[in-house]
Amino acid sequence: MGFRLPGIRKTSIAANQASSKSVEVPKGYLVVYVGDKMRRFLIPVSYLNQPSFQDLLNQAEEEFGYDHPMGGLTIPCKEDEFLTVTSHLNDL
């Protein structure tokens, strides 16, 4: 019997908490900021070893290096592109 990995956690966090940097990050998740508005998402760390997510990480490295002033990982792509990638990962 397999386990289904939980998807990104943005939908389960109240809107006022999602914009707060002081929200605790659950074990097994990390914070990423995406898009022009730097929207905050919590993603499972298991996404980090997936090739499609690694492409996003490579974009982040090329644009920002290892300097991420928001306190979390900044991914320089459009929000809809990020949601497409993560929704495919959630289906795995």
Curated annotation (Swiss-Prot):
InterPro entries: SAUR_fam
Keyword Hydrolase on entry: no
Designated name of the protein: Auxin-induced protein X10A
Protein biosynthesis as UniProt keyword: no
One of the GO BP terms on file: auxin-activated signaling pathway
Family to which this protein belongs: Belongs to the ARG7 family.
Induction line: By auxin.
Transmembrane spans: none
Keywords associated with the record: Auxin signaling pathway
